[in-house]
Swiss-Prot record:
Family matches, as Gene3D superfamilies: 3.30.230.10, Histidine kinase-like ATPase, C-terminal domain (3.30.565.10), MutL, C-terminal domain, dimerisation subdomain (3.30.1540.20), MutL, C-terminal domain, regulatory subdomain (3.30.1370.100)
Similarity annotation: Belongs to the DNA mismatch repair MutL/HexB family.
Species: Bacillus cereus (strain 03BB102)
UniProt keywords, alphabetically: DNA damage, DNA repair
Protein name according to UniProt: DNA mismatch repair protein MutL
Pfam families (UniProt xref): DNA_mis_repair (PF01119), HATPase_c_3 (PF13589), MutL_C (PF08676)
Role of this protein: This protein is involved in the repair of mismatches in DNA. It is required for dam-dependent methyl-directed DNA mismatch repair. May act as a 'molecular matchmaker', a protein that promotes the formation of a stable complex between two or more DNA-binding proteins in an ATP-dependent manner without itself being part of a final effector complex.
């Protein structure tokens, strides 16, 4: 007798369950997606012990006919595709026909379903075996209960996390589904306590408010773009509203939530230098495309996809985000902290905006006060700050648009994956309806972020603090400017322009600079010599494991030439494979930081005016190249509120 044998269906389903049903969140995902495919407009999810004891999904969808109930629990049985051509034009969330038999094989499952035009069907399955099947009275839709998950595969239970973590995984999945299908009303309960309720009115922003809070919803920038192949819609937060994890970015493709690193990277690239290192935005991006352009049959969980025109899609995302931010004045509003806000678990940001006309970058020249001969040398730091110019005295009134709900400036860093965001409350239908109506009203009252340009407003300097921060004012209130970050932005745009030019003017070194490397480093650098020439670094081999530099571009900051060369060499060694775009970017950022004013340096009146004028000419006067804010705004209203002049 041969050694190779065909596995029976029960064992095959248990093996398939290892991929499809990894944890309770997988069960919730598959069942809710089935409900959506069945045209449900209302779905309830009830959990006990994070789904390990019980998962119940109730929907008002099409239901399952009696003759289909048994077939639905057979392997690779589905109503969603018929032939191989359908496999390349998938519009439904499910299509593999693996979920139901896999779930039924590792749990005790009860199904009550009806199509509405015939008696319903009641089905009980335990470990893949049908225990009971009978007709029953039932409303249209499906009610499916999964109990004692993994009861017959106890080894799987050893790999389950804590109830808190497993519940976090489920809420994360439900949140993504709610965002991708705002037209469906979703209710999520855990141990009879409500965690989420969306209205199903199709307003994505209201769903985002339910998940992330109304404060975050107020800081959302609408994103919309269209090309021949793709349509993009969604919302992303202003650069100041960030989190410490990428998990707050959601990408939806043809109604399906997917995990795709390159899409998240494209969203980050859309922000470019607006985000601090290690910080990520909250974002929701829905992408519609011809199903022929995306392969969703990559993994049984259907979370991974492949795109046939990936580069075109990434470019569209980056350009769309960059264009949106160029229309907004990205000045953060410092806000006023209140006792009420100190009690809030989710602390959010409050900012204000206005817009900047890109201009040709030019070399900053703020070191010498106006009127001084360039040959003269004067130290930038002086012992006492100079008396600055005073603007004409005016009677200013706080604009009504500035009277807003106050909130703290510090961003929340609590990941949504760890625990449910909203406070658990005992379920009460009347209270629930009231809360939902109240949320709808709040979302409708949110003012759209003005997209009327991002020019820096006129700023009139009034002082300097600790030789680090410049104070300025205008009719909208007080502005605090970080002088180092401001000049860093000016220098960055200058160096970014210079470092990208092929034709370079060079300065000969009086004494060639020698660089000694290990053999591994030498070989790595030798491989990238041509790439280094593109950023103005010309190396000659000198001996066995050394290079020498005889010249450098004239725009290298004076006195820092060797330090910059060492830094660029270190980047090449660290990166292993040189990305010329990244290398130019890093070189520009490094030089801009080293050439900028440092803290504790007092500036003269002329220097401050020159700095602010140079800042005005930049394409992005709001953040330094590292993503830190350059200036912060205190509105007149907020100042008056702090001093109790208004209540």
């Amino acid at each position: 007798m041969g050694k190779i044998r065909k596995l029976d269906d029960q064992l095959s389903n248990l093996i398939a369950a290892g991929e499809v049903v990894e944890r309770p969140a997988s069960v919730v995902k598959e069942l809710v997606e089935n409900s959506i495919d069945a045209n449900s407009t209302s779905i309830e999810i009830h959990l006990e012990e994070a789904g390990l004891s019980k998962i119940r999904i109730i929907d008002n969808g099409d239901g399952i006919a009696e003759e289909d109930c048994i077939v639905a629990f057979e392997r690779h049985a589905t109503s969603k595709i018929k032939d191989e051509n359908d496999l390349f034009r998938i519009r439904t969330l499910g299509f593999r026909g693996e979920a139901l038999p896999s779930i039924a094989s590792v749990s005790e499952l009860e199904l009550i379903t009806s199509t509405g035009d015939a008696p319903g069907t009641h089905l009980i399955i335990k470990g893949g075996d049908i225990i009971k099947q009978e007709k029953t009275a039932s409303r249209k839709g499906t009610d499916i209960t999964v109990q004692n998950l993994f009861f017959n595969t106890p080894a799987r239970l050893k790999y389950m996390k804590t109830i808190h973590t497993e519940l976090g995984n489920i809420t994360d999945i439900v949140y993504r589904i709610a965002m991708s299908h705002p037209e469906v009303s979703l209710k999520l309960f855990h141990n009879e306590k409500k965690l989420l309720h969306t209205s199903g009115n199709g307003d994505v922003r209201q769903v985002l408010a339910s998940i992330y809070s109304i404060q975050v919803a107020k800081k959302l920038v609408p994103i919309e773009a269209e090309s021949l192949d793709f349509t993009i819609k969604g919302y992303v937060t202003l650069p100041e509203v960030t989190r410490a994890s990428r998990n707050y970015m959601s990408t939806i493709v043809n109604g399906r939530y997917v995990r795709n690193f390159v899409l998240m990277k494209a969203i980050q690239q859309g922000y470019h230098t607006l985000l601090p290192v290690g910080r990520y935005p909250i974002g929701f991006l829905s992408i519609e495309m011809d199903p022929m352009l995306v392969d969703v049959n990559v993994h049984p969980a259907k979370l991974e996809v492949r795109f046939s025109k990936e580069q075109e899609l990434l470019k569209l995302i980056e350009e769309t985000l960059q264009a949106a931010f160029k229309k907004i004045q990205l000045i953060p509003d410092a806000g006023v902290t209140t006792k009420k806000k100190e009690k809030d678990e989710s602390v959010q940001e409050q900012f204000q905006f206005e817009h900047a006309k890109p201009k040709e970058p030019s070399m900053p020249d703020i070191i010498l006060p106006t009127g001084m001969d360039e040959k003269q040398e004067e130290p930038l730091a002086v012992k006492q700050p100079a008396q600055l110019w005073q603007p004409p005295k005016q009677e200013w009134q706080p604009p009504q648009s500035l009277v807003r709900e106050e909130q703290s400036w510090q961003p929340s860093t609590k990941p949504i994956m760890e625990e449910p965001i909203r406070e658990e409350k005992s379920w009460d239908s009347n209270e629930e309806d009231f809360e939902l109506e109240e949320l709808e009203e709040e979302v409708q009252e949110i003012e759209e972020i003005e997209m009327n340009g991002n020019d820096l407003p006129p700023l009139y300097p009034i002082g300097q603090m600790h030789g680090t921060y410049i104070f300025a004012q205008n009719d909208k209130g007080l502005y605090m400017i970080d002088q180092h970050a401001a000049q860093e932005r000016i220098n960055y745009e200058y160096f970014r322009d210079k470092v990208g030019r092929v034709a370079q003017e060079v300065q000969e070194l009086l004494v060639p600079y020698r660089i000694d490397l290990s053999l591994t480093e030498f070989l790595r650098v030798e491989e990238q010599l041509e790439e280094l020439k593109k950023v103005g670094l010309f190396l000659e081999q000198f001996g066995h494991q050394s290079f020498i530099v005889r010249s450098h571009p004239t725009w290298f900051p004076k006195g820092q030439e060797t330090e910059i060369i060492d830094e660029m060499m270190e980047q090449v060694v660290k990166l292993k494979k040189v990305d010329i775009k990244k290398l130019r970017e890093e070189a520009a950022i490094m030089m801009s930081c080293k050439a900028s004013i440092k803290a504790n340096q007092y500036l003269t009146n002329d220097q401050i005016f020159a700095l602010l004028e140079e800042l005005r000419t930049t394409t992005n006067p709001y953040t330094c190249p590292h993503g830190r804010p350059i200036l912060v705004h205190h509105s007149t209203y907020e100042l008056e509120k702090m001093f109790k002049r208004v209540m």
